From Swiss-Prot:
Natural source organism: Vibrio parahaemolyticus serotype O3:K6 (strain RIMD 2210633)
SUPFAM superfamilies: Acyl-CoA N-acyltransferases (Nat), Carbamate kinase-like
GO terms of molecular function: L-glutamate N-acetyltransferase activity
Pathway: Amino-acid biosynthesis; L-arginine biosynthesis; N(2)-acetyl-L-ornithine from L-glutamate: step 1/4
The name this protein goes by in its record: Amino-acid acetyltransferase
UniProt key word Lyase: no
Catalytic class of the enzyme: transferase
Keyword Transferase: yes
Family in the record: Belongs to the acetyltransferase family. ArgA subfamily.
Cited Pfam families: AA_kinase, Acetyltransf_1
InterPro entries the UniProt entry points to: AceGlu_kinase-like_sf, Acyl_CoA_acyltransferase, Asp/Glu/Uridylate_kinase, GNAT_dom, NAGS_kin, NH2A_AcTrfase
Predominant location: cytoplasm
């Protein structure tokens, strides 16, 4: 008898909303030269092919920084930098073109592989590269001639979209030609950023040395707003002044993410090229694995509606089974849905609370407080409480009270104090369950 993995089945089911959400969307992937050189490169290519097979339109932009440096060293050449940009003279341009050409062939070859007994078995991918990007020289800055280092002049988005619509993967590198027929060395992060903006991509994804932005505890920061990302850039620039990776790929991509976000790209993702499956975990799981730069938070606090009843019931059922919450039927929830506030993330209800006002006493009960077990390490309970406080004040309520059997200390930390049964509004006193012996706590607004 074959052993069937329930984890595999569960993973497929949980990823279904994301498969449906991402189908037909355009995503730009930044693949630095460090990622190509890493031993996880083959797995990254397999994951990109999987994305394509799920109906995602994929544009891959590759960098070649370490490969260029290796070739320069072999030829005993050095290239100066000005404002963290390589000055590309004639000799350096030849090396850059050689490195970029080799990487283009290597990536194309891996995407073309379809051997049996491999994740690419049966895959028939068309990889298209071309003069989609037109460059122009950076020129002279502070008396320094950048030579063949350039910037983007324009992008042929119509041609790229036609190629994507035909089912091909678009592959672009750091070399682009100009209207005069010259070649220029571009920053691959800038190429990826501008492609995402001009194509109206749904996502910009960058493979970095770390699993996104790392906090003081060594954990990836799940989400950053642009202004927060700017603060991170300032801190990283100061703390990693001698770290070449942070001063090139990671910081440049983070800067590009901010620009893309402010230009209308909904989300930019920073993930590690060292972690097997990071791309799939980031795109097809509830929590992701790296850092997102977003214009607005993926989590929303809002008033519940009739369509949220199923999600609320699913959230509170385990707590009802444990006796932490009083049971509520679907019918009761339908009648009281207007009193509920929820926290929603990517279509999943991860938190809820209800507010029952007693207008004559100018008091309100905060009840049915629940947070999804995977999200209890944040401040979402406090988020719901603050929302309830704001809502209570708007309804001319002076005090909020709760009945709890398990969360006494948390509520006391938020300023609640213990009161007796006689504190409760008359209508609530008659419903108090003396066998349950819930603690009653109040908060002055």
């Amino acid at each position: 008898m074959k052993i069937r993995s329930t984890a595999l089945v569960k993973g497929f089911r949980q990823s279904t909303p994301y498969v449906n959400a991402h189908r037909g969307k355009t995503m730009v992937i930044m693949l630095g030269g460090e990622a190509v050189a890493h031993n996880n490169f083959g797995n990254i290519i397999n994951d990109i092919a999987l994305m394509h097979s799920l109906g995602i339109k994929v544009v891959v932009v590759y960098g070649a920084r370490p490969q260029i440096n290796q070739l320069l060293e072999k030829q005993d050449l050095t290239t100066p930098y000005h404002k963290n940009i390589r000055i590309t003279d004639e000799a350096a341009l030849s090396v850059v073109m050689q490195a970029a050409g080799q990487l283009q062939l290597a990536i194309t070859a891996r995407l073309s592989m379809s051997l049996n007994n491999t994740p690419m078995a049966g895959t028939q991918l068309n990889v298209v590269s071309g003069n989609f990007v037109i460059a122009q020289p950076l020129g002279v800055d502070d008396g320094v001639d950048y030579c063949h280092s350039g910037r983007i002049r324009r992008i042929d988005t119509d041609a790229i979209n036609r190629t994507l619509d035909q089912g091909s993967i678009v592959l672009l590198g750091p070399i682009a030609s100009s209207v005069t027929g010259e070649c220029f060395n571009l920053l691959s992060e800038e190429v990826a950023t501008q492609l995402a903006i001009k194509l109206g991509a749904d996502k910009l994804i960058g493979f970095c040395s770390e699993q996104g932005v790392i906090d003081d505890n060594g954990n990836a920061v799940a989400e950053l707003l642009p202004i927060e990302a700017e603060h991170v850039i300032k801190t990283l620039s100061e703390n990693h002044a001698s770290d070449s990776d942070y001063n090139t790929g990671t910081l440049r991509f983070l800067k590009g993410s901010i620009a893309a976000c402010r230009a209308g790209v909904p989300r930019s993702h920073l993930i590690s090229y060292k972690v097997d499956g990071a791309l799939i975990q980031e795109l097809f799981s509830f929590d992701g694995i790296g850092t997102q730069v977003v214009m607005a938070s993926a989590e929303q606090v809002r008033q519940a509606g009739i369509d949220d009843i199923g999600g609320i019931l699913e959230l509170i059922h385990p707590l009802e089974e444990q006796g932490i919450l009083v049971r509520r039927s679907r019918e009761q929830l339908e009648q009281e849905i207007g009193k509920f506030t929820i926290i929603e993330k990517d279509g999943l209800i991860i938190g809820c609370a209800a507010l029952y006002p007693y207008s004559e006493e100018r008091k309100a009960e905060m009840a049915c407080v629940a947070i999804h077990p995977d999200y209890r390490d944040g401040n979402r309970g406090l988020l719901l409480l603050n929302y309830m406080k704001h809502r209570s004040k708007s309804e001319n309520i002076n005090q909020i009270f709760v009945l709890t059997t398990h969360s006494l200390h948390w509520f006391r930390e938020q300023g609640f104090y213990e009161v007796g049964v006689d504190y409760l509004p008359g209508a609530k006193q008659g419903l108090y369950n003396f066998q349950r012996k819930s603690k009653i706590l109040a908060l002055d607004l």
